[in-house]
Amino acid sequence: MVRLILEHTLQGHKGRIWGVAWHPKGNSFASCGEDKAIRIWSLSGNTWTTKTILSDGHKRTIREVRWSPCGEYLASASFDATTAIWSKHECTATLEGHENEVKSVSWSRSGGLLATCSRDKSVWIWEVAGDDEFECAAVLNAHSQDVKRVVWHPTKEVLASASYDNTIKMFAESALDSDWDCTATLSSHTSTVWSIDFDADGERLVSCSDDATLKIWRAYHPGNDAGIATPDKTTVWKCVCTLSGEHSRAIYDVSWCKQTGLIASACGDDGIRIFKECSDSKRDAPTFELLTAEESAHEQDVNAVEWNPVTAGQLISCSDDGTIKIWKLQE
């Protein structure tokens, strides 16, 4: 029987913890929350300890932290409407421009682009212009409501965003004029889309929502053998699977493991659930099964989950209950 084994419970933040992010090497992670601080944790022997506290970068709650692909930089998105860039435990740049809370931040695969999104309904794309310099390359106003999450495609410079307007949007740079355009709108959820994550090759996307469902989307490129029409020769995204009935409240985060293909969800019912694609799953109509559920993973809402990028089967979670938990999937 497959189950999640709790390996560590970590405390240190004051108040709710909003975000956790594994370092690309998988041997440390960053956390952020209501206390306006970022903590960097690493494993010492068999104990996870806070190595550094970064507390001078933001004036309000920090909503999300993300490491650059090289692992040298950390970006933090805050309710103070700024995004901070950290290097060697120092705040080296502060990105200003959003009118309201910054909800999410994401680095492109190359590390040359950074995306941010906000309650002001906009998505900003920043170019890394040199040492600690960032230039705004685009301001995208495609959403009609608060934008909750931005995530870059794992291999291409394609950006996905999730919003309070119930949609997901895809953005890419135009080959004609170098402008960033909205290339697709993914509509199927009936309430806020809280989070999204690509699979390993970026051909599929998982989304989670306030409507208590997970949805799997597939990319259909021009000339695809499924016969899906692609107007203007742009990639079309279709919802190919809806997972409902397993969550009783809003699903706040989702993580698609790049090594195992397992999907983890973080829910407002205090639970964490792991889904596996069925062995007889079809490409254009995939099926997933609930592999295991930790119904009381935390004492309050689970805000974030993320699979370790190096250690297969290791999962981290954080919650309104002020704890971070590290889990191991045991088969």
UniProtKB/Swiss-Prot annotation:
Keywords associated with the record: Repeat, WD repeat
Family from the record: Belongs to the WD repeat CIA1 family.
Entry's transmembrane regions: none
Family annotation (Gene3D superfamilies): YVTN repeat-like/Quinoprotein amine dehydrogenase
Matching Pfam families: WD40 (PF00400)
Residues in WD repeats: 12-51, 57-96, 97-136, 142-181, 188-227, 246-285, 297-331
Function summary: Essential component of the cytosolic iron-sulfur (Fe/S) protein assembly machinery. Required for the maturation of extramitochondrial Fe/S proteins.
PANTHER family: CYTOSOLIC IRON-SULFUR PROTEIN ASSEMBLY PROTEIN CIAO1-RELATED, WD40 PROTEIN CIAO1
Record GO biological process: iron-sulfur cluster assembly; protein maturation
InterPro entries: CIAO1/Cia1, G-protein_beta_WD-40_rep, WD40/YVTN_repeat-like_dom_sf, WD40_repeat_CS, WD40_repeat_dom_sf, WD40_rpt
PROSITE patterns in the cross-refs: WD_REPEATS_1, WD_REPEATS_2, WD_REPEATS_REGION
Lineage: Eukaryota, Metazoa, Ecdysozoa, Arthropoda, Hexapoda
Protein name: Probable cytosolic iron-sulfur protein assembly protein Ciao1
Top-level taxon in the UniProt lineage: Eukaryota
HAMAP family reported for this sequence: ciao1
GO cellular component: cytosolic [4Fe-4S] assembly targeting complex; metallochaperone complex
